[in-house]
């Protein structure tokens, strides 16, 4: 079976908040986050999750992708949908635990994604996080 495919969540308005967050970083930090996302593209049924310290479970099927650059810590919250890994929310981490507000944003985007996929199934998006409904 083929590898999973990481895609950016795309809002109803066409916005891609995770991509926008990454694009707003300096080149070194952007490259580090993109390397972590590329690790997700290597996952498959045989290896469905990245090990700690790259990733960890947040709640239910919601997971966090971790990235450290010196004293800066970044998180991308994501969830799987069949063969897709949907990148839902990205933020700089400044506390010990992922704040509930950040989790709520990711869960809201997941419900939006899931609702639109069920309402109108589409062809899978392009690889490496180009787009998702």
PLM regions: where:
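Basic, Lys/Arg-enriched alpha-helical interface segments
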Residues: 1-73, 82-85, 92-133
């Amino acid at each position: 079976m083929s590898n999973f495919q990481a895609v950016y969540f795309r809002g109803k308005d066409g916005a891609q908040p995770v991509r926008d967050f990454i694009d707003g970083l300096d080149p070194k930090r952007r490259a580090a986050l993109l390397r972590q996302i590329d690790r997700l593209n290597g996952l498959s049924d045989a290896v469905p999750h990245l090990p700690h310290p790259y990733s960890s479970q947040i709640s239910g099927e919601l997971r966090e992708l971790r990235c450290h650059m010196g004293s800066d810590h970044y998180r991308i919250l994501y969830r799987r949908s069949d063969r897709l890994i949907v990148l839902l929310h990205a933020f700089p981490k400044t506390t010990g635990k992922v704040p509930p507000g950040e989790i709520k944003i990711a869960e809201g985007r997941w419900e939006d994604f899931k609702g639109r996929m069920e309402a109108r199934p589409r062809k899978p998006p392009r690889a490496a996080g180009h787009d998702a409904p």
